[in-house]
């Protein structure tokens, strides 16, 4: 008896097995098919018999791009002709679409365009930032009602000569004094060497007959009393500071003269403080 066994390996898709019976004294290589008896089970011929040969018949038999050798693992790579190659021409500039031309020829034009876009963008961003900063700063400024209280108009004809009138301005007392000619001459004759905070009377007034001061003592913030004290000006009852008719400190613990606010005479009979 002769038996042969072999493995086709990667050649299985192209090989097929056949057998032929020859009469002789030896045992046939393939036994003859015996009809099945009713007692034996009949195979379901409609169900495909899975084997290497049947599966190889179902394999795709298209042109191969790459084949395998005898001593390497079997693999098949097919050529795909339906794959679309990406094309980015729509996103590229016209100057660099031609691959046969050097990009140096159009570098100046492309750089100029880039600089132009950068410059326009920078100007736009700066303008937008300016508007944002302006709105932010404006939001922190005083409102209209606060600005209205920032200035006060005073009618000078309501203040008699030699008298002092007190007004409320920005939450502080405001002294407006109508000085006599004697007070004007007296304060102008004071030597600066006698003053703790040296300042001439003419430097503190715009018109000699009118003295405008903030009525807050420079020591601890008390409100002085007008037409009182040793110098006939203002006197702070808290700690005994004496000011003259020009608001200059003459005696007591106060270190500085009374503050002179910003004011302007709009007419002979009207002054605006603030």
Curated annotation (Swiss-Prot):
Organism superkingdom: Eukaryota
**Chief location bin:** mitochondrion
**Which GO molecular function annotation, any one, does this entry have?**
metal ion binding
A cellular component term from Gene Ontology for this protein is: mitochondrion
Cystine links in this protein are: 222-238
Membrane topology, Mitochondrial matrix segments: 79-103
The answer to whether keyword Transcription applies is: no
After translation, the protein is modified as follows:
Proteolytic processing is necessary for the correct insertion of UQCRFS1 in the complex III dimer. Several fragments are generated during UQCRFS1 insertion, most probably due to the endogenous matrix-processing peptidase (MPP) activity of the 2 core protein subunits UQCRC1/QCR1 and UQCRC2/QCR2, which are homologous to the 2 mitochondrial-processing peptidase (MPP) subunits beta-MPP and alpha-MPP respectively. The action of the protease is also necessary for the clearance of the UQCRFS1 fragments.
Q: Where does [2Fe-2S] cluster bind?
A: 217, 219, 236, 239, 241
The UniProt transmembrane annotation reads 104-140
Protein's name according to its UniProt entry: Cytochrome b-c1 complex subunit Rieske, mitochondrial
The annotation note on the cofactor reads: Binds 1 [2Fe-2S] cluster per subunit. Fe-S cluster delivery to the Rieske protein is mediated by components of the iron sulfur (Fe-S) cluster assembly machinery that reside in the mitochondrial matrix (including HSC20 and LYRM7).
Q: Which cofactor does it need?
A: [2Fe-2S] cluster
- Taxonomic source organism: Pongo pygmaeus (Bornean orangutan)
Compartment(s) of residence: Mitochondrion inner membrane
């Amino acid at each position: 008896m002769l038996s042969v066994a072999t493995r086709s390996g990667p050649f299985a898709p192209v090989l097929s097995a056949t057998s032929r019976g020859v009469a002789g004294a030896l045992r046939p290589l393939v036994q003859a098919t015996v009809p099945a008896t009713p007692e034996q089970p009949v195979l379901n011929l409609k169900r495909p018999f899975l084997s290497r040969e049947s599966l190889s018949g179902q394999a795709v038999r298209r042109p191969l791009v790459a084949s395998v050798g005898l001593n390497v693992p079997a693999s098949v790579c097919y050529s795909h002709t339906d794959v679309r190659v990406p094309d980015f021409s729509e996103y590229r500039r016209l100057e660099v679409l031609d691959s046969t031309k050097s990009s140096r020829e159009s570098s100046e034009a492309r750089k100029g365009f880039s600089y132009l876009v950068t410059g326009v963008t920078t100007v736009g961003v700066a303008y937008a930032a300016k508007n944002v900063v302006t709105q932010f700063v404006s939001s922190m400024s005083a409102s209209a009602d606060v600005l209205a209280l920032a200035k006060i108009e005073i009618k000078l004809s309501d203040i008699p000569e030699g008298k002092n009138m007190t007004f409320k301005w920005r939450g502080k007392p405001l002294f407006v004094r109508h000085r006599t000619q004697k007070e004007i001459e007296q304060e102008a004759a004071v030597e600066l060497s006698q003053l703790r905070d040296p300042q001439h009377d003419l430097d503190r007034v715009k018109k000699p007959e009118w003295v405008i001061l903030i009525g807050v003592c420079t020591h601890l913030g008390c409100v002085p009393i007008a037409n009182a004290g040793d110098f006939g000006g203002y006197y702070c009852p808290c700690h005994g500071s004496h000011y003259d008719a020009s608001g200059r400190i003459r005696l007591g613990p106060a270190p500085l003269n009374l503050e002179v606010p910003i004011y302007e005479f709009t007419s002979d009979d009207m002054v605006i403080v603030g």
